Amino acid sequence: MIVQEPVLQLCRAVSEAGGRALLVGGWVRDYLRGCSSNDYDLEVYHLEPDVLRHLLETQGTVNPVGAAYTVYKVRLRYQRRSLVADVSLPRRESKIGRGHRGFVVTGDPFMTFEEAARRRDFTINAILFDPLTQEVIDPFNGRADLDNHLIRLVDPATFVEDSLRVLRAMQFAARLEFTIDPQTMAHCREIDLHDLPAERIWGEVEKWLLRSARPSIGLLAARELGILEQLWPELQSADLNALGHSLDLAFEETAPLDYPRRVTVMIAILCRNFTLGIPAVERFLDRLSLHTIERYDVRRQILSLVTHRNLPFTWSERAVTDGDYRRLALEVEPGLLARVESATCPDQRMIVDHFLDRVRQLGVEITPPPPLLLGRHLLQLGHPPGPRIGEITRAVYQLQLDDRVHNLDDAIAAARSFVQ
């Protein structure tokens, strides 16, 4: 993997000023695994904060995101291209309270590499890389753990201070398809997770479900780490092997979907068979703070998908009209329902495919048919404003769903019959 020129240019500027810029975290981990990454995270040593800030401003647009401990997002410029890198001083953390927020963090450019790496969660994330010399600095043997596909904590004394690391262990196990070290697993089980806010939990769940080719690994890890017991008791009674298989299938099937719909399908599969029904699903969504994403009502769709689970199979056993399919699209996206049911019941794929073919033929895979008759049409015909307009348009729309109204002329004629 080649470090991009804007990053090298920044590292040279730091070196010329008397400092040293090292890549840390995910970029280094991916580089050593032979994977590409644009996740540039640089730690700068031996430069005072004011000097670093001034230097960064010569390289690009600087946005401070952690002024207390000197963290910057820098949009680096090079010729006509640009990229964003996170640049920070090494950080010294002091524990002052419970949970993942109970820290005072200060930048310290004169820490040793080992001191700086010790605050990181896992050895595979505690490796430093010098882009100018190609030197790999590995104070905690993270390379060996990478080779052994092992997730191992850096320092038992500090690891337990940040409860979010338990969920990070889960999502890294899934994304990297690594095994969690038994001692690390034991430390994770001792950590209370109830201090974690919903937004931070969702951040790790999103990485687990949407960035892992095998989410099943994370699901089984969540059980062993104590996450199910503490945060998601609804999943404790589930057949995790079957559920994990469904998630793995859905990860592939949702690849063509946009982000909000991918979230919707993956979470709906998790919630589909909760024994306590919709109230349990609502509580689960609350714990993830899932509502609307990119103006798409994820929460409503998930609840509707769970409500209509098994519907393609029950409909295969009776006569179903085109109107039934169109009305279904008023309540849930039939295309998403097909994906959820296909991943959950892969042995019934032919039934789901027939269901999906039907909704596509009718043009209601995503949305119901738009109404032909609108209130403005009735006003143009001289109908007085009032609630009766809504009653008429709704009645005509029902006829449209049943194929008894095919165009605007039909709709207006039907409306006149309701007025008389």
Question: PLM ranges: what are they?
Answer:
Residues 1-420:
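Catalytic cores of the polymerase beta-like nucleotidyltransferase superfamily
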